[in-house]
Amino acid sequence: MINAGIVGGTGYTGVELLRILVQHPKVKLKVITSRQEAGTGVDELFSSLRGQIALKFSDPAKVDFSKCDVVFFATPNGIAMQQAKALLDSGIKVIDLAADFRIKDVAEWEKWYGMTHAAPELVAEAVYGLPEVNREKIRDARLIANPGCYPTAVQLGFIPLIEAGAVDADHLIADTKSGVSGAGRKAEIHTLYAEASDNFKSYAVPGHRHLPEIRQGLSERSNGPIGLTFVPHLTPMIRGIHATLYARLTRDVDLQTLYENRYANEPFVDVLPAGSHPETRSVRGSNFCRIAVHRPGNGDTAVILSVTDNLVKGAAGQAVQNMNIMYGLPETTGIRHVPLLP
């Protein structure tokens, strides 16, 4: 069994991680932390977990991780970078669901996240946990930088075109939509029911923190810099991401065949039949990314539609997928959930 700990278990990604791990046949949860809820039973705070877990939240200042093989950080940005080194030095593997280790250029990270990085020496070692790209590196990793929700959907949508050199990589466009759970569980005015319901809006158009992460990943697949216009939107739904991606083709290519071949052996990327329009509800509660490809009017513009659940493939599910790879388990162990419909 893999003995696991969770730092920060009261947010949406934390409880999603709990939901997945309590059902995982090869994992035993040893500890879960929360400053505010220390001493409270996990199933008292989250009634959905009644009968599934007997742990209480522990004070992170007093917790002992020595019995853990791996620790997940489901915390705000800036926490994992302060604690990861001590865990790694103790032989404990770390999977960070926040952004602390995603961007290799530390100065760039500090610019976007507005803080000094506490462990720049670990950034180079951290493996970016997108299995469809870095599976072999993930196998041997001690420290995983779990991808962001938008970056997962956007990169999986663009990667086949970028790798094939079939598009103008200087002028990519990602028009993305997310449910309100992507903003986290903290109380904020823009996610109140009266503000978010019956409403639809863009945000962070001048620049979003996920832009450098997406740009970094696609540049690696392109073997050169890429240009990306990234516009996120907040939609009146709880969970889900829909990315509509645009790229100008530079040569004739069979998009359907290209995508089917690229993802033929990927257990969690589903390339839909030609002409399909994926829906966010088709992946709700699952670790799947569903993709459809289009070429309107047989012109020179490729339109790629990519949908994920921001809390699963965009966060907790992908983190467990990475854990499975790190420990030599079948990749789908404990995360091949059928999406919830309706």
UniProtKB/Swiss-Prot annotation:
Keyword line: Amino-acid biosynthesis, Arginine biosynthesis, Cytoplasm, NADP, Oxidoreductase
Catalytic reactions on record: N-acetyl-L-glutamate 5-semialdehyde + phosphate + NADP(+) = N-acetyl-L-glutamyl 5-phosphate + NADPH + H(+)
Active site: C149
Cross-referenced Pfam families: Semialdhyde_dh, Semialdhyde_dhC_1
EC main group: oxidoreductase
EC number: 1.2.1.38
Cellular location(s): Cytoplasm
Pathway: Amino-acid biosynthesis; L-arginine biosynthesis; N(2)-acetyl-L-ornithine from L-glutamate: step 3/4
Gene3D superfamilies assigned: Dihydrodipicolinate Reductase, domain 2 (3.30.360.10), NAD(P)-binding Rossmann-like Domain (3.40.50.720)
Gene Ontology terms for molecular function: N-acetyl-gamma-glutamyl-phosphate reductase activity; NAD binding; NADP+ binding
InterPro entries per UniProt: AGPR_AS, AGPR_type-1, NAD(P)-bd_dom_sf, NAGSA_dehydrogenase, Semialdehyde_DH_NAD-bd
Gene Ontology biological process terms, A to Z: L-arginine biosynthetic process
Any one Gene Ontology cellular component term annotated for this protein: cytoplasm
Major subcellular location class: cytoplasm
PROSITE patterns in the record: ARGC
UniProt record similarity statement: Belongs to the NAGSA dehydrogenase family. Type 1 subfamily.
Function of the protein: Catalyzes the NADPH-dependent reduction of N-acetyl-5-glutamyl phosphate to yield N-acetyl-L-glutamate 5-semialdehyde.
Name this polypeptide is given: N-acetyl-gamma-glutamyl-phosphate reductase
